[in-house]
Amino acid sequence: MAEAKPAPEKEAAVKTESVPVADDEAASAKEGSTSLVSIDEYLAAGVHIGTQQKTQDMMRFVYRVRTDGLYVLDIQSTDERIRVASKLLSHYDPSRILVVSSRQYGQHPARMFSRALGTRAMLGRFIPGSLTNPQIHGFFEPDVIIVTDPAGDAQVLKEASSIGVPVIALCDTNNLTSNVDLVIPTNNKGRKALSLVYWLLAREVSRLNNTPFNYEMTDFETPL
């Protein structure tokens, strides 16, 4: 099983929607704990399904490795990090928040997140210099950034680091977390997983800010 070189996080998949869920994978959530949605909903969305590669950065979020070599993420950690990220985002002016996704299945959820909260979004191919060069069309210097995949959005992380803007990232088991300030451990490749995570983030930020939120999770799901 491949391991990538570790990089410290700055803070103090394979088929993802057709993989059967083992009963004991719900054990990663503490019995009797209150999660943002039911554990069954997290499992059904495949949020816990990682890849067959892992990095040292992400090992602390891994619940177990399956017999087929697939790493399974800890759902309780995912739930907790969504809460932490939502609380952090609620302290920012939405117009100063930037959500980024080059990954196909992340673009619609990110767009809906932006629409629900009134944030900025950069979707699809990221134009180098968009955060650092005022001469670039669409230049924007945000106060905080959310990225869908540190690998696919690597240029965004590089530019954010150069200008000192904090980054929240959806990270799978194969991701490195250098230049990431807050990791949300999740399947960041699956259509349903991405829609659920972005929907929960938008819902929780709205709740914390006492603003209306009239969206269902299916509104965030990329159409087939």
Curated annotation (Swiss-Prot):
The keyword Ribosomal protein belongs to this UniProt entry's keyword annotation: yes
The protein's name: Small ribosomal subunit protein uS2
InterPro entries: Ribosomal_uS2, Ribosomal_uS2_arc, Ribosomal_uS2_CS, Ribosomal_uS2_euk/arc, Ribosomal_uS2_flav_dom_sf
The entry's keywords: Ribonucleoprotein, Ribosomal protein
HAMAP family: Ribosomal_uS2_A
Family: Belongs to the universal ribosomal protein uS2 family.
GO cellular component terms, semicolon-separated: small ribosomal subunit
GO biological process entries: translation
Skewed-composition ranges (Basic and acidic residues): 1-14
Annotated stretches, region: Disordered: 1-32
NCBIfam families: uS2_euk_arch
Molecular functions (GO terms): structural constituent of ribosome
Keyword Ribonucleoprotein belongs to the record: yes
PANTHER family linked: 40S RIBOSOMAL PROTEIN SA
Source organism of this protein record: Methanosarcina mazei (strain ATCC BAA-159 / DSM 3647 / Goe1 / Go1 / JCM 11833 / OCM 88)
